[in-house]
UniProtKB/Swiss-Prot annotation:
Domain called F-box: residue spans: 1-47
GO MF entries: auxin binding; inositol hexakisphosphate binding
Protein induction: Repressed by miR393a (microRNA) in response to flg-22 (flagellin-derived peptide 22).
Gene that encodes it: AFB2
Purpose: Component of SCF(ASK-cullin-F-box) E3 ubiquitin ligase complexes, which may mediate the ubiquitination and subsequent proteasomal degradation of target proteins. Confers sensitivity to the virulent bacterial pathogen P.syringae. Auxin receptor that mediates Aux/IAA proteins proteasomal degradation and auxin-regulated transcription. Involved in embryogenesis regulation by auxin.
This protein's GO CC annotations: nucleus; plant-type vacuole; SCF ubiquitin ligase complex
Keyword Flavoprotein tagged: no
PANTHER family xrefs: F-BOX/TPR REPEAT PROTEIN POF3, PROTEIN AUXIN SIGNALING F-BOX 2
Identification of the protein by name: Protein AUXIN SIGNALING F-BOX 2
SMART domains: FBOX, LRR_CC
Pathway note: Protein modification; protein ubiquitination
Length: 575
């Protein structure tokens, strides 16, 4: 294609949006590499320590949108120490020095300080979008800087962050000239909200499509907000407690009927279930419903709400819905594509809420289902075989049995055959999480049949090193492998070091890996960062005559092109 001018090729590249496809076309020839270099504006980095910002900017000098991830995924389950790292400040400093025209920044599991938010807000004139997911380290003072200084802000999306609320006045820092907001999500904030400032901001934002409120926004304020913004598509309700005969409730009911654009509903952080009927008139339009934080909504009130939601494609719910409730979902929501069922009783002291019966019902009634996360207290091989037959289009299948090592509760057999049926039937499966009593046999099935698998999470599973080897040898597209409390050791770790060159990362905690094995791995694979995370009192592994047999608590290894990171805390030993 050398006879095409560069301008034509660049225009064609503009239609290639997949990061994987952009990477592939940059490898075709030097000319395409150069064109792709200067035309790529969006970059995704799955590990902030795999590259440094200076090298990124040399590679893509016209960067406008950056997505950056920090801590490993198991940080979501408190398996990564709080002070491990993942600091965004060095990235923002480098971006500011380069004077790149950054417009969008998306961060996940990173440490974000007020200083970094202040610098971000003052360094990029056309900055438009900030999305923070599961981040920590900042306060509402940092949010105030973003509000005050980002004059073209379109999206401020705060999802499940740990934020210190110094005052509830940060919303008043948006200037009166700010009319560009499309997304405003502060549901994770715990403190008070300046309702006057919020209502004024919403009223002057004609393009606002997504609004998610915290529990400090009461029902009467919600009614006023929705009256100002009937164009809202995605609504997150905060506090929802009122008498259904109250004036506030009646006003909300009248306003909601006019919100014909609503397609997504979430929140209800504090709710009076009998008030849900106010939303029934618009439920027939909903495609997404997230009640994973609505612990007070259950029973008949929940069932009635779902029965009105016939177009749902995405449902996040608590397991208090029960098997009978899932049967209602199955009979009502024929367009359902994604289901997540979260535990309402993490201590496991209550009665079994959902079982294999609910999962089978969903698989039979929702033929378009392709993604599931299902927390339950029991499962059977027969149920998993049925699910595999009913839903062969799964791309994500995550099953968490809350009691580790629990077998098929009918036959007392391992769940190998059930998960084997899933990987055999679901040819496009890319993400899989296992639980229950499992032997090496299930990993043989995974290695043989899960040809498209990119991420695998293992807990309390397997018999020997063979199990891990089956996966490493068979799953050619594996990117992330995370293992905890399983009997895999040095033999599996060291069998094929070259495999890690094509993977993004490997996490192993409470396994049989030794310090000696980790050192040998580091020697064989200098392109890897091999991190030993040790939280004992000495903050160091003991280096003595027995170190070869000393097990490591946590191993995290990942590819890098910039060598060892410089911000590791004392309890992280980088080999």
């Amino acid at each position: 294609m050398n006879y095409f001018p560069d301008e034509v090729i660049e225009h064609v590249f503009d239609f290639v949006t997949s990061h994987k496809d952009r990477n592939a076309i940059s490898l075709v020839c030097k000319s395409w590499y150069k064109i792709e270099r200067y035309s790529r504006q969006k970059v995704f980095i799955g590990n902030c320590y795999a590259i440094n910002p200076e090298r990124l900017l040399r590679r893509f000098p016209c960067l406008k949108s950056l997505t950056l991830k920090g801590k490993p995924h198991f940080a979501d389950f408190n398996l990564v120490p709080h002070e491990w790292g993942g600091f965004v400040l060095p990235w923002i400093e480098a971006l500011a020095r380069s004077r790149v025209g950054l417009e969008e920044l998306r961060l996940k599991r990173m440490v974000v300080t007020d200083e970094s938010l202040e610098l971000l807000s003052r360094s990029f004139v056309n900055f438009k979008s900030l999305v923070l997911v599961s981040c920590e380290g900042f306060t509402t003072d940092g949010l105030a800087s973003i509000a005050a200084n980002c004059r073209h802000l379109r999206d401020l999306d705060l999802q499940e962050n740990e934020i210190d609320d110094h005052r509830g006045q940060w919303l008043s820092c948006f200037p009166d000239t700010c009319t560009t907001l499309v997304t405003l999500n502060f549901a994770c904030l715990e403190g008070e909200t300046n309702l006057v400032a919020l209502e004024r901001l919403v009223a002057r934002s004609p393009n606002l499509k997504s609004l998610k409120l915290n529990r400090a926004v009461p029902l009467d304020a919600l009614a006023r907000l929705m009256a100002c913004a009937p164009q809202i598509v995605d609504l997150g309700v905060g506090s929802y407690e009122n008498d259904p005969d109250s004036e506030s409730y009646l006003k909300l009911m009248a306003v909601i009927k006019k919100c014909t654009s609503l397609r997504s509903l979430s929140g209800f952080l504090e709710a009076a279930p009998h008030c849900l009927s106010a939303f029934h008139p618009i439920c027939h339009n909903l495609t997404s419903l997230n009640l994973s934080y609505a612990a007070e909504i259950h029973g008949s009130h929940l069932i009635k709400l779902i029965q009105h939601c016939k177009k749902l494609q995405r449902l996040w719910i608590l397991d208090s819905i029960g098997d009978k409730g899932l049967e209602v979902v199955a009979s009502t929501c024929k367009e359902l594509q994604e289901l997540r069922v979260f535990p309402s009783d993490l201590l496991g002291g209550g009665n079994t809420a959902v079982t294999e019966e609910g999962l089978v019902a969903i698989s039979a009634g929702c033929p378009k289902l392709h993604s599931i996360l299902y927390f339950c207290q029991q499962m059977t091989n027969a149920a998993l075989v049925t699910v595999a037959k009913n839903c062969p289009n799964f791309i994500r299948f995550r099953l968490c049995i809350l009691e580790p090592n629990k077998p098929d509760h009918v036959t007392s057999q391992p769940l190998d055959e059930g998960f084997g049926a899933i990987v055999k039937a679901c040819k496009s499966l890319r993400r899989l999480s296992l639980s229950g009593l499992l032997t090496d046999q299930v990993f043989l099935y995974i290695g043989m049949y899960a040809n498209q698998l990119e991420m695998l999470s293992i807990a309390f599973a397997g018999d020997t090193d063979k199990g891990m080897l089956y996966v490493l040898n068979g799953c050619k597209k594996m990117k992330k492998l995370e293992i905890r409390d399983s009997p895999f050791g040095d033999t599996a770790l060291l069998a094929d070091v070259s495999k890690y060159e094509t993977m993004r990362s490997l996490w192993m905690s409470s396994c049989e890996v030794t310090l000696s094995g980790c050192k040998r791995l580091a020697e064989k694979a200098p392109w890897l960062n091999v991190e030993i995370i040790n939280e004992n009192d000495n903050n160091r592994m003991e280096e003595n005559g027995h170190e070869g047999r000393q097990k490591v608590d946590k191993l995290y290894l990942y590819r890098t092109v910039v060598g060892t990171r410089m911000d590791a805390p004392p309890f992280v030993w980088i080999l």
